[in-house]
């Protein structure tokens, strides 16, 4: 298979940065991170690993990325316990394979992203039973019609590292429409405070020479999200780094101290939104 070349400074590069991070985490801690697919996928991608990605900041970033995927998988598994036939929808999927970690043999997966990302996904991952890849712009709500939603079965959406790049008014419109269209569903995504967006630009995006990409959306008060729509039943913020399981001592004292600060300060959050029941 010819390797897919990822050009630096593009949105497509965001496909590979978390992929490489999860690979690093898997290489170091194979007993606690379960994304075995990332190691295989990365062997088929042509990508220049920067010194920053392979250094200390890269190590911290890899742990954060792998932990984020663990968090998303945890929320999906919990939802599937009560809704075993639910749709599991990966918003801005890139090369993420979270569904393969939570698949119970009955749920149905939908992976959504821009056409070029879906093309790369199709080439590297191919089709799997009960998985559908949809090329779309999330802001074009016509993708709703491509989801075979059955209210009695339920639906859970997750988005990893996606909404930072959306303008707040677009996020509000999307969330409100989703809550109305998919009653009793659930949405989980990661977020930061407004102050955290500046750190993202300085440390991560510009550090990886992704200078043409901007970030907009942040969450300083999760209660604001609930007020966006009467179809949103609840919204809560959980710790990103130790909200779903304890930190591992092997990460190191300093790293864990930094992670605890990021959670406590809400610089790193996992947001869970429950959509109201119909009627």
Listing of model-derived features with the role each one plays in the protein:
Residues 213-239:
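Short alpha-helix
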Residues 1-89, 93-136:
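Rossmann-like AdoMet
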Residues 248-279:
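Core SAM-dependent methyltransferase catalytic element
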